[in-house]
């Protein structure tokens, strides 16, 4: 019963807000007689989306593939670089400011550059753009998780003469996991946004970005909004996948009644490092 109530509390409030927003939008368009090419009514968008759903779905698959490939490569690159930054302070001091500065550059500035570097008709520039954005998000978060380990845990492990690799395995990596999943939940929808915005500037002519711009250019605003809805659904799917992955990888978060405290857990881990400790 509590699980049903929890789901109810999570899903119902956003649904109510969404229904109120769409209803208000519909009323405003009809009352003020706003022209469809300026702002179509949600009912018009829904009808057009139904008529063109096969095209929108195909566009979602293309943009989703670019976002997924870039997301996977970005996570791998970000995690790998975070270990390098954790290990070498000099590299951390050099790379972190550069990563922050590059992350502040708008997507619309870098995509044309990548299109010139690679063939604009391929998906490489868009996937590379997603990889770059995602890797920065993952890098900054995971590097922070690897470094900001509890001082108590570190002192306890040092008291057991733990080696750097043992500290990494028993303290730093477990601490960084929550940072990784936080970064993943941020990066997943950002990957979709980056993928379809990158399509504004070339590449495949059947992705979500091209569908938005091409329909807007000929004043088919309702059709353009249909592709926007497709982008929203795709971003939501990526986010929910990240949340599900976190739940599957961290089952202890669902039930903590019989879990030891952080201090007890560290003590148990550290005993395995002490030759004279308990082995039971």
Language-model features: where?
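Periplasmic/extracellular loop-to-transmembrane helix junction in inner-membrane transport proteins
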Residues: 3, 31-75
């Amino acid at each position: 019963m509590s699980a049903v109530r929890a789901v109810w509390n999570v899903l119902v409030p956003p649904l109510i807000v969404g229904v109120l927003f769409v209803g208000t939008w519909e009323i405003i368009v009809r009352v003020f007689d706003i022209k469809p090419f300026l702002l179509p009514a949600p009912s018009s968008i829904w009808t057009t989306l139904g008529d063109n759903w096969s095209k929108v779905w195909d566009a979602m698959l293309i943009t989703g593939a670019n976002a997924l490939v870039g997301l996977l490569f970005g996570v791998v690159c970000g995690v790998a670089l975070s270990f390098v930054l954790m290990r070498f302070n000099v590299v951390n001091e050099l790379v972190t400011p550069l990563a922050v500065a590059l992350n502040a550059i708008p997507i619309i500035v870098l995509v044309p550059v990548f299109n010139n570097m690679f063939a604009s008709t391929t998906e490489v520039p868009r996937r590379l753009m997603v990889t770059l954005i995602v890797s920065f998000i993952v890098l900054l978060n995971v590097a922070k998780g690897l470094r900001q380990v509890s001082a108590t845990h570190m002192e306890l492990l040092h008291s057991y003469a733990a080696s750097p690799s043992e500290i990494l395995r028993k303290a730093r990596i477990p601490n960084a996991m929550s940072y990784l999943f936080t970064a993943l939940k941020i990066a997943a929808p950002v990957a979709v946004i980056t993928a379809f915005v990158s399509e504004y500037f070339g590449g495949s002519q059947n992705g979500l970005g091209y569908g938005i711009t091409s329909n807007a250019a000929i004043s088919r605003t309702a059709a353009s909004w249909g592709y926007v809805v497709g982008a929203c659904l795709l971003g939501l799917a990526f986010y929910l996948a990240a949340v599900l992955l976190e739940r599957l990888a961290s089952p202890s978060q669902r039930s903590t009644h019989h879990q030891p405290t952080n201090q007890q857990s560290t003590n148990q881990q550290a005993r395995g490092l002490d030759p004279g400790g308990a082995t039971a």
